[in-house]
Amino acid sequence: MGSQSETVCVTGASGFIGSWLVMRLLERRLTVRATVRDPTNVKKVKHLLDLPKAETHLTLWKADLADEGSFDEAIKGCTGVFHVATPMDFESKDPENEVIKPTIEGMLGIMKSCAAAKTVRRLVFTSSAGTVNIQEHQLPVYDESCWSDMEFCRAKKMTAWMYFVSKTLAEQAAWKYAKENNIDFITIIPTLVVGPFIMSSMPPSLITALSPITGNEAHYSIIRQGQFVHLDDLCNAHIYLFENPKAEGRYICSSHDCIILDLAKMLREKYPEYNIPTEFKGVDENLKSVCFSSKKLTDLGFEFKYSLEDMFTGAVDTCRAKGLLRPSHEKPVDGKT
């Protein structure tokens, strides 16, 4: 797998993960078909067209998860498909119809396109940590056998609940379809993705990751006992699992875990110019971190390259350079939230 003459398709190619993955695939001289909802929207696709080798090895294809069959042409003739696209509207007034249903139907639509193409050797799906550990009481360690509690999600309606439900139900539906239709299917389960990026707007995962800096308290619950992976490690893992013939099933991709207190301490030391809290409601130093085990991935031979500090330095530097994060805040009176 992974020869330079191969053609692969990346869905959601203009997004945070998709665009970085396209960049890494182009560096390996693969021909990439990138699907986006509107290839004529220059603001949304310029960062893709500006990539090295884009002129010779990249084409943009119009496709939408809500439009069944719209991925058929882009996938036809490809040997690999990376399904990264997913609706990310956390503020949706109608999450069942605007987020959950389109995610599941879009996933199955991609799989039908792969089956119809008859050229796709492997489909790699970007799942989410939200498919694994959303439940009332956290375990100390999670692995690929764990699944989130959908009833708890729908009852609790925590920040991003509709995203967790949509990814879980989509992945479960995909495994059923893959087994019934003999599709070589791999899922990657990233934890919170952090790092530098090439898209022009603020990635949703960085709204969460950088919430101690921005003071966006609604997102603190997600990183109260957080797990993290560098965007570049994640994209390299996608390619590694596509190319490795021994890969099968689900793979957690997570390199670091820490509680929000320790993350805030690291960020305060690194960025004293920001108003970063010293205390968080309901959190003290006795709170245990929760681990997402990447043992299955590393046992296959994959190696993580980046530290937690690398992730956040890359994210903050990029946000500042793009004008998405103010260079400093005035100090608060008490440093608490």
Swiss-Prot record:
Catalysis: reaction(s): a (2R,3S,4S)-leucoanthocyanidin + NADP(+) = a (2R,3R)-dihydroflavonol + NADPH + H(+); (2S)-flavan-4-ol + NADP(+) = (2S)-flavanone + NADPH + H(+)
Enzyme class: oxidoreductase
InterPro entries referenced in this protein's UniProt entry, alphabetically: Epimerase_deHydtase (IPR001509), NAD(P)-bd_dom_sf (IPR036291), NAD(P)_dehydrat-like (IPR050425)
Keywords: Flavonoid biosynthesis, NADP, Oxidoreductase
GO terms under biological process: anthocyanin-containing compound biosynthetic process
GO MF entry, a single one: dihydrokaempferol 4-reductase activity
Keyword Oxidoreductase: yes
Pathway the protein acts in: Pigment biosynthesis; anthocyanin biosynthesis
Active site residues per record: 167
Disulfide bonds, paired cysteine numbers: none
Keyword NADP in annotation: yes
Top-level lineage group: Eukaryota
Annotated positions binding NADP(+): 12-18, 37, 44, 64-65, 84-86, 163, 167, 190-193, 205
E.C. no: 1.1.1.219, 1.1.1.234
UniProt induction comment: By light.
Binding-site positions, substrate: 128, 133, 163, 204, 208, 227
Family affiliation: Belongs to the NAD(P)-dependent epimerase/dehydratase family. Dihydroflavonol-4-reductase subfamily.
Function: Bifunctional enzyme involved in flavonoid metabolism.
Annotated protein name in UniProt: Dihydroflavonol 4-reductase
